[in-house]
Amino acid sequence: MKTIDLFCGAGGLGEGFRQAGFSALYANDHETPALATYKENHPDAVCSTDSIETVDPKKIREDLGVAPGQVDVVMGGPPCQGFSTYGQRRDDDARNQLYVPYFGFVEEFRPKAFLIENVVGLLSMSGGAVLADMVARAEALGYAADVVTLDACEYGVPQHRRRVFIFGAADGQRIDPPQPSHVNGKRSGVVLNDQPSLFFDGPSIQPALTVRDAISDLPDEVLVPRDTQKPMEYPEPPKTEYQRLMRGNSTELTHHSAKRMLGIRRLRLAMLHPGDYGTKIEERLADGGLNDELIDLMMGGAGMRDAAECRTQDREKEAALREVLKGGHTTPAKVMEFLDSQGFANKYRRLRWDAPSHTVVAHMARDCSDFVHPGIDRFVSVREAARFQSFPDTYRFPGSQFRQFRQIGNAVPPLLGRAMAETIKVAIS
C-alpha cells in the first residue's frame, strides 16, 4: 500500500505506516536535515525539500507513474508552530495556511484516504475557523472527514502527548478512530514474561507504559554531544516487552548522548526527587542540605561541562559558587543565591519512573531542563527521548545532537502513527 508523506519531518508518522505495511512513494519537507533522516530510514521514497507551495502535484504524480486513485493515503502534519499552545501562538502565522497546498495533493492524487496530524491548538485556531476550513475542503473533494484527539500513551507510547487527527476516506466512507490499547494510569514496571505484547495477543486494554518500561535497560553513562553517532553496547537484556519491541534486531545502541552541564545545574538536579519540579529545590535543600559527595560531584563529576565553553557570566557564577563551597558556606540560603538565580531553578523537572513521560518537545534541542533522568543526575539522552517517542533503536538520526533532539521532539510517535495506519488500512482494504 502506497503513501504520499507531506511535511514528513524525520519520519515518525511514516515509520508508523511502514510498520503497518505501507510504503512511501514521495516525501516532502522543507528542512534538509529532517529529510536526510527520513531518507536514511526510508531509502525507497523519492524525497524533496522543494516548497510545497510551489511544487506541481500533477507533475509529481506523473513522475511517480501513478494514476489518480492509485495512492492509498496522502498524509502529513503541516508545521504546527503556528497552531501550538507551547509558547506564543500567532493566528497570522503564514505556516497556518500550509494545509491549503496539502489539499492540492489530495485533489490531484485522489487517494483512498487522507490524514492530517497536528497539535491541539489547531482546534481553537481563529475560533475554530482553520479546522472548519480543513473539514470543508476535504468534504468538497468527496471525503468524509472526522476529527479526533488522541493521547499517545493510550496507544503503547510511554509518553503523554495529545494530538489532533483529521482523516477520512473517499466516496464518503467513514473510518473508525483507533481503539485505545492502553489506559492512562500509573504502575510499576512489569517484567518481560508477565507483560502481553503490544499489538499482539493479550488483554484489549493494558496499563499505560512508563518511563521505567521505556528506558530501564539503557546505560547510566552517556556519551558527550559530539560523540552522539558513536555506538555503544547494551548493558543487559531487555526487561520489558516494550524494550524488546524497541530493540528489534538492533545489536548496538546509538545516539545515547546527553547534554553536559556546569556544577550549578548539576546541584539543581541533585536536589530533585522523581516527579519534582524546580520549585522544590529550596525545600529539598533545606531538608537534606549539601553533603560532601554532592559537593565533590559538582566540583568535578563525570559529564561536567568545560567552563571555558560557556559564557563569561556563567563562568564567573560557577567560579563564585566553587569558592563558596570550598569555604564551607553551604547553608541553604547561601547556596540558593546561586541555584535560583533569576528564577531559573523553576524550569527544572525530574521524570518519574512509574508514570509516562510528559510531552517530548523540539525545544530539547536547546534545553533539556524539564527532562531530568529519574534516577541519575543528568538530562535524558537522545535515545531515551526517542524511546519516549516510540522510535525503534534501529531508527537512525544523522547529524548533530541538536538536530536529533529537534527532529525527535517534532515527530509523530511511530506507534501512534501505526494505530492510525491500522484503522485506515482496515477501512480501505
Curated annotation (Swiss-Prot):
Protein family membership: Belongs to the class I-like SAM-binding methyltransferase superfamily. C5-methyltransferase family.
InterPro entries: C5-Methyltransferase (IPR050390), C5_DNA_meth_AS (IPR018117), C5_MeTfrase (IPR001525), C5_meth_CS (IPR031303), SAM-dependent_MTases_sf (IPR029063)
Pfam families assigned: DNA_methylase (PF00145)
Enzyme Commission number: 2.1.1.37
Record has Methyltransferase as a keyword: yes
Name of the gene this protein is made from: ageIM
PROSITE patterns per record: C5_MTASE_1 (PS00094), C5_MTASE_2 (PS00095), SAM_MT_C5 (PS51679)
An annotated Gene Ontology molecular function: DNA binding
Residue positions of the active site: C80
GO terms for biological process, alphabetical: DNA restriction-modification system; methylation; negative regulation of gene expression via chromosomal CpG island methylation
Domain SAM-dependent MTase C5-type residues, every copy: 1-429
Keywords: DNA-binding, Methyltransferase, Restriction system, S-adenosyl-L-methionine, Transferase
Superkingdom to which the source organism belongs: Bacteria
Catalyzed reaction equations: a 2'-deoxycytidine in DNA + S-adenosyl-L-methionine = a 5-methyl-2'-deoxycytidine in DNA + S-adenosyl-L-homocysteine + H(+)
Name recorded for this polypeptide: Type II methyltransferase M.AgeI
Entry keyword annotation includes Transferase: yes
